[in-house]
Each structure stands twice: as structure tokens, then as C-alpha cells.
């Protein structure tokens, strides 16, 4: 039986951080009580990120992939392609939330759930320069591409049907992969819901 959640986490040169973060992510997933898999996609690291993930994932449903070159978008693409879950989730190694997934399963008739930093009720506790950069990027996105989505980065949960339909259609890689995937989903008429989140990355917490 397919797991409820496939959590895809790209990592790059995170060997020192993974021993803290990956067990915390596993604990968050265990708190949900649903079957899950975590797919760590190490991409082009010069350290031992992949081995650190294997060591930190003992007795947990964690798969570790390694790619030759550093490419965040390709890491997401490959992780999504390998996923089996009903919901395919994009988390970062320093930014994840079981509460976000509880919101996902509480929704009905939806294909993409975005944890939007711009949604009313959200709290963005990141450094000011990062908050400004996010606002500028999303303003350009809405202006140039006429998107109604307020935030294409951060936590996202995609339905199995959406991933099976659109993952192979995305041509962008690096930091624009998920942006293109969200825009394609919007233009294809998939049902998108944005929910509030609290953004406080573990490194700065």
C-alpha cells in the first residue's frame, strides 16, 4: 500500500546539520500516525551529506539518493519521480512542519496546498533581507506571469495525480523548478489552496 506522504528533501553540504534535523523530521512525521516515506536527495555535495543521512535514518522509512551535480530543482524532480505517496511534499532540511500536513489532510477536493508566507495569519520570522527578497520575487511573478499564487517557495504538498501529470513537463531546474511546477498546476486548472504557516528555520531558532 502506498504511504500517505512522500516527503522530498533536497540537501547540499549538510553533513553537520543532518544529524540534528533528520531525526527531528522523522519525529514530526511519526506524530501524524500516517504511513510515510522520506526521500533525501543529496545533490553534488563535497561533504558526507549522503552518509550522514543514512546514519541518521536508522530504522526509519528514509531513502537516500545522490546526484552528481548541485541542482536543487533536479533534486526535487528526481525525488518527486521516485515518490510513491498519495501526497508528495517538498520540505527543506531546516524548514518542515507536521502541522502543515495536518492542514493538508483536513482539506477536501484540493490538488496543491502551499504554505504561504504571505497568507493572512502567517508569521515570517526569517531575517529581513530574506523576507524582502521573497516579497520582490513573488511580486514579479504575479506581475509578469499573472499568477494569483502569493508564494511559490517554501512548504508545498502536491496530489499524486498532479505529480504524475506535470512533473515530467517542467523544464526549469535549480531554484525555478518548483515555481514552474506551481504555475503549470495553476494554468492546468488544478485546485490550489494556500494556508498560513509560521516560518522559523531551525538554524536560526
Give the ranges of each region predicted by the language model.
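Conserved sequence signature across two-component system core domains
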Residues: 7, 11-12, 41-43
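Short, well-formed alpha-helical segments that are part of the catalytic scaffolds
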Residues: 14-29
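Catalytic donor-sugar/metal-binding loop of nucleotide-sugar-dependent glycosyltransferases
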Residues: 147, 170-173, 182-200
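Acceptor/aglycone-binding surface of glycosyltransferases and processive sugar-polymer synthases
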Residues: 67-82, 87-90, 98-175, 201-205
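Active-site acidic Asp-centered loop
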Residues: 43, 89-94
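Cell-envelope/extracellular polymer assembly enzymes that use nucleotide-activated donors
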Residues: 4-6, 37, 180
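A conserved acidic beta->alpha catalytic loop
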Residues: 42-51
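Donor nucleotide-sugar binding loop of glycosyltransferases
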Residues: 14-17, 45, 72
